[in-house]
Amino acid sequence: MMQRCWRLTVPLAKRGLAVVTHTRQAVVSDNPEAENLDGFEQQYLKERIEITTFQRMLLGAGSSIAAILDPRRHDMIACLGETTGEDALWNIMDTMHESEEGQRIMVEKPRIHTSTIDFKRLESLPADTFGAAYVKFLKDNKVTPDSRMAVRFLEDPKLAYLMTRYRECHDLIHTVLDMPTNMLGEVAVKWVEALNTGLPMCYGGAVFGAVRLRPKQRRAYLKHYLPWALENGKQMKPLMPVYWEERWEQNVNELRAELGIKLLNKV
């Protein structure tokens, strides 16, 4: 049965992607408000893929099934986030405007990848700083900030930036939570992100990711990781308005205390 679903789902998702590809077009030149857009927004409007409501539903359904069957399909997970997350992103936008830090992020639109971050400087920082902890996380888990997929299906360029920001900050959230990138760590982080951002894809990743845990992992998850994630997700401050790039030199434990984060006592 699972194989049959997979044979139906993958073509469905691919068909949805194929259907919308031909509608890609540059809209900036014909938009009278384009001159008020910043560089990120103008570039996004040139590269976005415009889709209809039906196509959005098709992509949402296909990508959700594909992501459930194979959580390693990051392309399907990314697609799911964009086709289901618009309402949550508008709520995040409101949160961004409630703080000076969040407002500056929306104006400056910083990016996190190897061409924008001086990783050599971060490596030289004291071990107890957030920047040093981030570099250590990347090395220990063999991940890179350059692996995030570009946003393509959101209509509003400001929401597209918020989704981009969420993706690029994912490893920073792992760092501040002191969670690895194994399945157990990812599920725990997804619960925190779900409660903190309200993004449907985070709830989906948390629920369906937990189903794939091995028996020993599931016991640890139910006894320790899930209660910890739910507590943190409910009590911590919003993470999206944090200007992480300005916190590199901050003591990582002081940053956690500021955000209301309690670390899990590893067992």
From Swiss-Prot:
It is found in: Mitochondrion inner membrane. GO terms for biological process: ubiquinone biosynthetic process. It is a peripheral membrane protein. Zn(2+) binds at H170, D171, H174, E186. This is Ubiquinone biosynthesis protein COQ4 homolog, mitochondrial. Its cofactor is Zn(2+). It comes from Drosophila persimilis. The keyword Membrane applies. This protein may be expected to contain an N-terminal transit peptide but none has been predicted. Lyase that catalyzes the C1-decarboxylation of 4-hydroxy-3-methoxy-5-(all-trans-polyprenyl)benzoic acid into 2-methoxy-6-(all-trans-polyprenyl)phenol during ubiquinone biosynthesis. Pathway: Cofactor biosynthesis; ubiquinone biosynthesis. Component of a multi-subunit COQ enzyme complex. It catalyses: a 4-hydroxy-3-methoxy-5-(all-trans-polyprenyl)benzoate + H(+) = a 2-methoxy-6-(all-trans-polyprenyl)phenol + CO2. Its EC number is 4.1.1.130. GO terms for cellular component: extrinsic component of mitochondrial inner membrane. Pfam families: Coq4. It comes from the Eukaryota. InterPro entries: Coq4, Coq4_euk. Keywords: Lyase, Membrane, Metal-binding, Mitochondrion, Mitochondrion inner membrane, Ubiquinone biosynthesis, Zinc. Belongs to the COQ4 family. The keyword Cell cycle does not apply.
